[in-house]
């Protein structure tokens, strides 16, 4: 894509005004911006993602990889969620986990980049219309999609970056509602990223208690 941008850029007038927009602005993007702009002014619009973190109750679980499934079942049995999104880091794990949940009486849908767009739209509509309450997703749905009734996000696999974490958990508690997030920490790399999130965003996170106070997140919708 960068080559296409450069090709277009070279055909534009030398004397011009250039504006570039990005949802996030990591150092790698800043480097690219400098190639197309001279002494640019950086404008940061309200960082909704970070502000939203403060409205979420965030929990973590230290465990081994082999313990994840049992802990997930325990959480789904005990948490009174409206809808939940469970994030994993690969398409294979996305399909496998969704299948396992469905076979164990937790009807689930799996959404990832390998699905045809028509199928993704169909599954998206099922979830948005509250016909499905559990979604297993890859980073594809880590940002840019909002569901009114999602009040729980579970990081079955820790995100690969602090920025991705912020966007993932931001799927919970949208539109002024409450929400909780639960992150599985299975190794040192998981802990490193989680600690970075806590430090950079000045948020509080607690070990997952035996029972979560239902008053800290939205109750079930009544239809």
Label every model-predicted segment:
Residues 1-223:
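Conserved helicase RecA-like core
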């Amino acid at each position: 894509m960068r080559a296409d941008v450069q090709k277009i850029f070279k055909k534009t007038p030398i004397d011009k005004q250039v504006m570039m927009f990005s949802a996030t602005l990591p150092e790698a993007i800043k480097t690219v911006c400098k190639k197309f702009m001279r002494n640019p002014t950086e404008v940061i619009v309200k960082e909704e993602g970070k502000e939203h973190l403060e409205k979420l109750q965030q929990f973590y679980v230290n465990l081994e990889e082999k313990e994840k499934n049992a802990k997930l079942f325990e959480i789904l049995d005990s948490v009174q969620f409206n809808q939940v999104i469970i994030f994993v880091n690969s398409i294979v794990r996305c399909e496998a986990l969704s299948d396992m949940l469905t076979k164990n009486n937790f009807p689930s849908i799996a959404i990832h980049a390998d699905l045809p767009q028509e199928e993704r739209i169909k599954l998206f509509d099922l979830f948005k219309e509250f016909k499905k309450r559990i979604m297993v997703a890859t980073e594809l749905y880590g940002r840019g999609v909002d569901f009114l009734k999602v009040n729980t996000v579970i990081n079955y696999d820790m995100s690969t970056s602090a920025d991705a974490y912020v966007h993932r958990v931001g799927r919970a508690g949208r539109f002024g509602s409450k929400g909780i997030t639960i992150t599985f920490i299975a190794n040192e790399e998981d802990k490193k990223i989680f600690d970075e999130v806590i430090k950079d965003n000045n948020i509080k996170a607690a070990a997952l208690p035996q029972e979560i106070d239902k008053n800290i997140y939205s109750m079930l919708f009544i239809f």
